[in-house]
């Protein structure tokens, strides 16, 4: 059986050590692995010893990678597993790393799910349906997700939905009242809010344009329609413009009024 004839510190990483067996480089280990297996000059190692030492070193590498990954933000168990897989860590090592992370309480899917809901419902205005799908994609089980979402009350959901629509109304001044309402409802659906929450939010919002704002929005769309259909005052071009503007949600009375104005 070979003997350890030399142990040297790596130049680029002083926490790792090169192990030489019978005067030939054999492998390297982390400082903690060196201490754990009591590696020192003159120690005899058989094949099983070497396999055990190298496995322990792979676990240490995986553990360090996981800690670095966790240092940026909280992660789910699946996120850590996926990260280690990308680093070509073997399944047995991943399982051991996850076990240790749980022992040290670096991983907790219940706490992760609760924090995820708390953060994303406020910063991104996401509704329960979207949060549910995202957490499931991160490997959180349905019961844990439901428990986390229980803190997102109907009142809180409605409040976040109202905030989202109010931002939309400030941004989209070029839309008709009808389009504003439709777009608001669609965006809330995409954000993951239920029909009941959307209805409650829409009831709280004043999305009706004042007359001047509605007319200004109509004029902007009319200019596009005039160019698109080459409006020349003829019946045919006027009908195409009217249909275009009506589909955009403007009233026929307002459209007729615009077309009758002298400049048109």
UniProtKB/Swiss-Prot annotation:
Function: Negatively modulates RecA activity.
Source lineage: Bacteria, Bacillati, Bacillota, Bacilli, Bacillales
Keywords: Cytoplasm
Official protein name in the record: Regulatory protein RecX
The keyword Cell membrane is assigned to this record: no
Subcellular location: Cytoplasm
Annotated Gene Ontology cellular component terms: cytoplasm
The family this protein is said to belong to: Belongs to the RecX family.
Consequence of gene loss (knockout): A single recX deletion rapidly increases RecA expression after DNA damage.
InterPro entries to which the protein is assigned, alphabetical: RecX_HTH_1st (IPR053926), RecX_HTH_2nd (IPR053924), RecX_HTH_3rd (IPR053925), Regulatory_RecX (IPR003783), WH-like_DNA-bd_sf (IPR036388)
GO biological process entries: regulation of DNA repair
Pfam families xrefs: RecX_HTH1 (PF21982), RecX_HTH2 (PF02631), RecX_HTH3 (PF21981)
Source superkingdom: Bacteria
């Amino acid at each position: 059986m070979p003997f350890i004839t030399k142990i040297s510190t790596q130049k680029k990483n002083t926490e790792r050590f090169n192990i030489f067996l019978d005067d030939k480089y054999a492998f390297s280990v982390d400082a903690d692995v060196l201490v754990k297996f009591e590696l020192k000059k003159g120690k005899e190692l058989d094949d099983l010893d070497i396999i055990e030492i190298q496995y322990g070193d792979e676990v240490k590498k995986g553990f360090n990678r996981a800690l670095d990954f966790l240092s940026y933000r909280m992660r789910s168990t699946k996120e850590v597993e996926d990260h280690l897989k990308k680093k070509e860590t073997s399944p047995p090592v991943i399982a051991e790393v996850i076990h240790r992370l749980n022992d040290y309480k670096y991983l907790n899917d219940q706490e992760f799910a609760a924090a995820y809901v708390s953060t994303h419902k406020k910063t991104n205005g996401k509704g329960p349906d979207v949060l549910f799908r995202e957490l499931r994609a991160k490997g959180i089980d349905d019961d844990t997700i439901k428990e986390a979402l229980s803190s997102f009350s109907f009142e809180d959901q409605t409040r976040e939905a109202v905030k989202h629509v109010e931002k939309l109304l400030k941004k989209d001044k070029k839309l008709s009242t009808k389009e504003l309402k439709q777009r608001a409802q669609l965006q809330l659906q995409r954000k993951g809010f239920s029909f009941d929450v959307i209805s409650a939010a829409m009831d709280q919002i004043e999305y009706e344009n004042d007359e001047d704002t509605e007319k200004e929005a109509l004029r902007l769309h009319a200019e596009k329609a005039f160019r698109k259909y080459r409006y020349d005052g003829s019946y045919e071009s006027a009908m195409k413009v009217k249909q275009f503007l009506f589909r955009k949600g403007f009233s026929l009375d307002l459209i007729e009024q615009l077309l009758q104005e002298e400049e048109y």
